Amino acid sequence: MATAVAAKEEPATRFAKDQLKAIIERIERLEEEKKTLSDDIRDVYAEAKGNGYDVKALRTIVRMRKQDANERAEQETILETYMQALGML
């Protein structure tokens, strides 16, 4: 008798299982898309390198373009201050 009750799931339990499964599948799909995008980005950098561009400089520019102007200016000021302190400027 206990197995008959266990075999029949409550609707709320079934809903929770279905919802959990859907969430996991979405995460897996997004992880796969993220991997594909990462591969595509790596290919673009490889193409740029093949065309003679400095990949390290490109990565720096991409990172800097993500920052707002004030944040970027502050970071550049700090870098310049450190470089002056080290006699590099």
UniProtKB/Swiss-Prot annotation:
Coiled-coil stretches noted in the UniProt entry, renumbered to this chain: none
Record-linked InterPro entries: GapR-like, GapR-like_DNA-bd
Domain of life, source organism: Bacteria
GO molecular function, one term: DNA binding
Pfam families in UniProt: GapR_DNA-bd (PF10073)
Family, as annotated: Belongs to the UPF0335 family.
Name of the protein in its database record: UPF0335 protein Nham_1221
Native species: Nitrobacter hamburgensis (strain DSM 10229 / NCIMB 13809 / X14)
